[in-house]
Amino acid sequence: MVLPQDLLSKSYTKPKVILCQTNKENICQLDATELSGTFKFNSYSEISFNVASVYQDLITGETKPTPYYDYIEGLRLVYLEGFGYFQLQNPELYSDGIKEYKSINAYSLEYVLSQRYLENFIINKGDVGDTIGSIDGVVLYNPNDSTHSLLHLVLQKAYGWTIGHVDDELANQSRSFEVDRESIYDFLMNEMCETFKCYIEFDTIN
């Protein structure tokens, strides 16, 4: 995750929280209260906030239903201005009979990769013994041959993600992998990063 450059400066202001569809289409800006976040470099980040079921119109003074309140549900996204997109988890509903609000946790968008899996994923093992179905001649990143590019092969099952920059000294390196079943996120962050001695920076905005 790329954090805003002014995060620790005096010019930093509270970011807008915008409710979005799963395709990142904006729905509306949320009146989020108790907004807080835990931002990490080597794992997905987390934010939390509350949204009340009603709000007070500043012009008329009337109490009105919060627009799209029912749309605040698990799997939809929010865009946290300057930070990126986050996937909503199922909110908790609180009510005292008079006031009602939803308490929401959301994880940075790369979290969705923990819900997609690689199965029988065998790379550079050769068809020897019990190892059948290996894709050989694979390097970390080959933009001219996606069938022999590890990053392309992994992201085939990760809709909406593309590959940005890969350091030249890493791109042509080759390693072997054999995965029975593992989430794409765990494979990327554990096996791949540890094996290639690299790190991944997820850009959820672009």
Enumerate the language-model features and the residues they cover.
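Short conserved beta-strand and strand-loop elements enriched in small hydrophobics
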Residues: 17, 70-81
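Short amphipathic beta-strand/extended segments with alternating polar/hydrophobic composition
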Residues: 27-34, 86-91, 151
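Solvent-exposed loop and beta-edge segments used for protein-protein assembly and interaction
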Residues: 41-43, 96-98, 194
